[in-house]
A protein has these predicted regions:
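Positively charged n-region of N-terminal signal peptides that target proteins for export
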Residues: 1-4, 571
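Glycine-centered signal
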Residues: 15-17, 236, 562
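A sequence-level/structural motif corresponding to short, flexible coil/turn segments enriched
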Residues: 21-518
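Cross-kingdom Sec-pathway N-terminal secretion signals
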Residues: 5-6, 20
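C-terminal outer-membrane/trafficking sorting elements
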Residues: 520-571
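Bacterial N-terminal signal peptides
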Residues: 7-15
Length: 571
């Protein structure tokens, strides 16, 4: 192993000084499409790495029974259930659609291990999430509502597992059309183990009832199975404890919300649940903000790192966990923070003020890689002291944060092309890429100089028109799995593969092998360890199991792992 490590080091020395100036050499592996028949129902919830080299992919497809648009197609073939009949989503009749989840376990070679889906309840894809768990399964945190009389106003979700077994999750206190959250624990075979309900308070306001009163924007899991939710709420939140009682979180800024679901108001929150989904502890801000959100979160080394957005309110001072929050009142400021996972005590809170005529920022990715936190998203303006954007459009950004101090040590924004966004980065040694989209080009892979974050010339991985949607990619050794939405025709880079003839828009997820990626081993003395070896990320996610140490570390991306109960750095 030492000889291999030295050889790889020599190879890196011979590599070009700036990877960002080199056209990325990528090789197509495989691709899949998920396609419903409605015009706006196909979207991505997320994808995560699972055990044994597999991954979980959660998408949504729309149904409208009035237009006979209730079925689903995968790779152009109609999807059937365990009984051999075509699967059918929730009934719905109207001008929009009902969102149904399609959950798949996929091997790293692209073969489908199993399918599961929902057929009651309207899933909000953009505020729902999946995250893998230590036991090889996953959590699905779903924002859902019962709004269809034919499906039953008390049926939040009906989950159909890979064997065809149906579980209906009811909420007798639900108000028709009210969004609530369900935390679902799903086993590695796709069966549903348990569900927990998180509800809010519905009140009559100027523009209607407060039925969209909370949103979860980020989810993380620690090595003990503890669950962390970040987001925004606007009335009250009710979370169940192990003793059967309910914890109530009360928002401070409630009077300014008129009930409009698109209103930019409310309070930020961080909620800790135990491994069984019961409430443990929470963190909210002290003082009143005009609006406050916690967005993406990642767990590492006993701490939570997250970003957010916060806008001040005249005459009000803000603190988070006793730490002062410096914030302006004219726009949402970018918030970066560190919190202890054990007791939710705050290590630091940093804010960065946007600059320019347009200052909106979207936070879409948060990754722990090689001892740093990488944030990605889009920004309409610049960020004070980091980068400028005078284009007046959303442009993809990357921030590299030192987790010890909260300081942004490097930053980048891509000003080329049209409206754009980054969802995440790939880093292995000196090889780095950013994945996102450009609405004038498609889904992009942009080479990045790992030392400076300078951006190279992008290639278009997927040409699909002007529809923009995606999620943080899966990093699987030297392979990367990405997803985006497209119209009914798309082509992929470096292959003759394409899809045509889909009903309307479709989701496509696909895998590429990235060139120039190699793995070296450092800071471990367990090289010759024999027997079954499990590999975990520092947030407790099982990456894979192997029959020897050498097989366990083979193919791992750069980063810090727990291998055989020891912390190991892959360089």
């Amino acid at each position: 192993m030492k000889k291999i490590t030295l050889f790889l080091a020599a190879c890196f020395m011979l590599a070009p000084a700036s990877q960002a100036e080199t056209q990325p050499a990528v090789t197509f592996n495989w691709a899949h499409t998920v396609d419903g028949a409605t015009s706006a129902g196909d979207n991505i919830i997320g994808m995560v790495k699972a055990s044994g080299g597999d991954c979980y992919v959660a998408t949504t497809w729309g149904t409208n029974s009035g237009a006979s648009q209730v079925n689903l197609w995968f790779d152009g073939e109609q999807v059937t259930g365990a009984d051999g009949a075509a699967i059918v989503g929730s009934p719905y009749t109207g001008t929009s659609k009902n969102g149904n989840m399609f959950l798949q376990k996929v091997s790293n070679a692209g073969s489908i291990v199993w399918n599961a889906y929902t057929r009651k309840g309207d899933i909000a894809h953009d505020k729902s999430h999946i995250v893998s768990t230590k036991d090889g399964g996953l959590l699905a945190v779903l924002k859902t509502r019962a709004w269809v009389a034919e499906a039953g106003y008390d049926n939040l979700v009906e989950y159909v597992d890979p064997t065809g077994h149906v579980t209906t999750i009811k909420d007798m206190g639900n108000v028709s059309g009210e969004y609530r959250y369900l935390v679902l624990k799903i086993a590695e075979n796709g069966s549903l183990e348990w569900s927990r309900l998180i509800a809010g308070k519905v009140e009559k306001r100027k523009k209607g009832f407060t039925k969209d009163n909370m949103s979860v924007y980020g989810v993380a899991v620690d090595e003990d199975g503890g669950i962390y939710l970040t987001g925004n709420f606007r009335t009250e939140m009710y979370l169940k404890k192990t003793d059967g009682t309910v914890e109530t979180l009360t928002a401070k800024n409630t009077t300014e919300w008129d009930g409009d679901s698109q209103g930019v108001v409310g309070d930020l929150f961080l909620a800790k649940l135990d491994k069984d989904g019961y409430f443990v502890k929470s963190l909210t801000a002290e003082g009143i903000a005009a609006s406050a959100f916690l967005d993406k979160v990642v767990y590492a080394d006993g701490n939570l790192y997250f970003n957010g957005r916060i806008k001040g309110k005249t005459g009000n001072e803000l603190t988070l966990g006793g730490k002062a929050v410096s914030v302006t009142n004219d726009c949402e400021n970018l918030l970066l923070a560190s919190v202890s996972a054990a007791d939710l005590s705050v290590g630091y809170v940093k804010t960065i003020t946007p600059v320019g005529s347009k200052k909106t920022i979207h936070n879409n990715g948060c990754q722990w890689i090689d001892g740093y936190v990488y944030f990605t998203g889009s920004s309409m303006g610049g960020l004070t002291g980091l980068y400028e954007n005078s284009k007046g459009q959303h442009k993809g950004y990357i921030l590299k944060m030192d987790p010890a101090t909260g300081e942004v040590v490097k930053s980048a924004i891509r000003l080329d092309g049209g409206i754009g966004k980054f969802y995440g980065v790939y880093l292995n040694g000196s090889t780095m890429y950013a994945f996102g989209y450009d609405m004038t080009g498609g889904a992009l892979l942009v080479p990045v100089d790992a030392a400076t974050l300078s951006l190279g010339t992008a290639i278009t991985l997927c040409k699909y028109g002007v529809v923009a949607a995606g999620c943080t990619p899966i990093i699987d050794g030297e392979n990367m799995v990405v997803a985006n939405r497209g119209r009914n025709t798309a082509t992929l880079y470096g292959t003759d593969y394409s899809y045509t003839g889909n009903k309307n828009w479709a989701m496509i997820y696909y895998s590429y092998k990235l060139a120039g990626t190699s793995v070296g081993i450092g800071t471990t003395t367990a090289e010759s360890q024999k027997g079954k070896t499990d590999v975990y990320t520092l947030d407790g996610r099982l990456v894979k199991s192997a029959q020897s140490y050498d097989k366990a570390v083979g193919g791992l991306a750069q980063g810090v792992y727990v291998i055989g109960n020891k912390k190991v750095t892959i360089r």
